[in-house]
Amino acid sequence: MSVIIQVFSDYVCPYCYLGEIALQRAAEATGAIIVHRAYQLRESQLQESGPPKLAPGGERMNAIWENTIYPMANRLGVDIHQPSRSPLTRLAHEAAAWARQLGVLDLFQRQLFNAFFIEDRDIGELSVLKQLAWNVGLNPNELEKVLAEHQMAEEVEEDLMIARTYNITTVPSFVIAGHVLSGVQDESVLIKAIKLAIAGELGAEALKLPHLPVNIARS
């Protein structure tokens, strides 16, 4: 029996980037199937102007990076840098939905995270998304058409609707057998949850699993 892990994440969330490592390892160890779903931390600002609420450089955000994100990245051996921008990610999610349709979602997501957290590029810009598409063997001009026509908008909206169904307001969030685990989870925690789900016992044990406060809430 293969357990499905629904993962809600956003490409501007450093914890989502770092959490991918434990997630992939847990899936490999158990045979679980990962289903990535879109979540927009700045969805409420899509029609607003002014500086983003998740803008880097403030005292609070700097403290989070110094006290939490960098130490976690060091433990995992992951290269990550605090970005200088906080773009809207709707186009990135639509591009990712298109990449999933073409069977290269994992590669494209890796490109998105690397572009933002290592290269400090604006993944809300069409030109950047086209370059990332090219990097994974996709046609950048076709992507431009897909995004201009919002061909994948319905898929993204469906993910956001599912997130609301589970009352998800922070990322990363994992849904396993109908139960939500919030925040970055250790590989061992995910493996335990998957095994409990296979045994049909996750309902009784879900509340005993740690819900780590290592996540980011929607602004």
Where do the PLM segments sit?
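Short, intrinsically disordered, charge-biased short linear motifs at domain edges
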Residues: 1-3, 60
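C-terminal cap of thioredoxin/glutaredoxin-like
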Residues: 3-9, 15-31, 36, 97, ...
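Structural alpha/beta surface segment adjacent to cysteine/selenocysteine redox centers
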Residues: 17-119, 205-218
